[in-house]
From Swiss-Prot:
Gene Ontology CC terms, in alphabetical order: plasma membrane; respiratory chain complex I
Cross-referenced InterPro entries: NADH_UbQ_OxRdtase-like_20kDa, NADH_UQ_OxRdtase_20Kd_su
Localisation per UniProt entry: Cell inner membrane
UniProt family annotation: Belongs to the complex I 20 kDa subunit family.
Molecular function as annotated in GO: 4 iron, 4 sulfur cluster binding; iron ion binding; NADH dehydrogenase (ubiquinone) activity; NADH:ubiquinone reductase (non-electrogenic) activity; quinone binding
Major enzyme class: translocase
Protein species of origin: Neisseria meningitidis serogroup B (strain ATCC BAA-335 / MC58)
Protein name: NADH-quinone oxidoreductase subunit B
Length: 160
C-alpha cells in the first residue's frame, strides 16, 4: 500500500504525499487522443479481456474530467495545436503517456514534412510505450510504470 509504518494501537504513520499518491495511482482517468492504429490497441485494453477498470483506469469523454492523456498514433503538424489545447484542459496533476513508434518519434512517417517527430515536442511525456502498434499488454505495462512513477512523486503540487 505504500504506508511506511503501522503502530501497535492501530495508528498509521505516513506522509500526506504517500496517501495522495496512493489515491492517484488507483484512479487514473485518461482522455484518449487516438490518431492511428495504436488507438485500436488502446480500445482492446479497455475491453473485457484486459479490463483497465480493475486498475482504476476509467476512460473519460472530456479532458476536464481526466488527468492522463494517452497519445496514440501519428501526430501531424496540423494536429499539434489541438493536442496542446487538450493537454492544457487536463486536470492537475496531469500525466501524458506516448503510445507507439509514431507518437514516440514519428515512426514510419518520421521523414515526412507534415509529421511531428514525437509528442514530447508538443507536451511533456511521462511514459513511452514502444511498438508498432504496441499490444494491449504493453499499454497496460506502461500504465503500471506510470503508477509507479506517481508513487515516487515527492511533492503534493507538481511543478511544470
Amino acid at each position: 500500500m505504500g504506508i511506511e509504518g503501522v503502530l501497535k494501537k492501530g495508528f498509521i504513520t505516513t506522509s500526506a504525499d504517500t496517501v495522495l499518491n496512493y489515491m492517484r495511482t488507483g484512479s487514473l482517468w485518461p482522455v484518449t487522443f487516438g490518431l492511428a492504429c495504436c488507438a485500436v490497441e488502446m480500445m482492446h485494453a479497455g475491453m473485457a479481456r484486459y479490463d483497465l477498470d480493475r486498475f482504476g483506469i476509467i476512460f473519460r469523454p472530456s479532458p476536464r474530467q481526466a488527468d492522463l492523456m494517452i497519445v496514440a498514433g501519428t501526430l501531424t503538424n496540423k494536429m499539434a495545436p489541438a493536442l496542446r489545447r487538450v493537454y492544457d484542459q487536463l486536470a492537475e496533476p496531469r500525466w501524458v503517456l506516448s503510445m507507439g513508434s509514431c507518437a514516440n518519434g514519428g515512426g514510419y512517417y518520421h521523414y515526412s514534412y507534415s509529421v511531428v517527430r514525437g509528442a514530447d515536442r508538443v507536451v511533456p511525456v511521462d511514459v513511452y510505450v514502444p511498438g508498432c502498434p504496441p499490444t494491449a499488454e504493453a499499454l497496460i505495462y506502461g500504465l503500471i510504470q506510470l503508477q509507479q512513477k506517481i508513487k515516487r512523486t515527492s511533492t503534493i503540487a507538481r511543478d511544470e
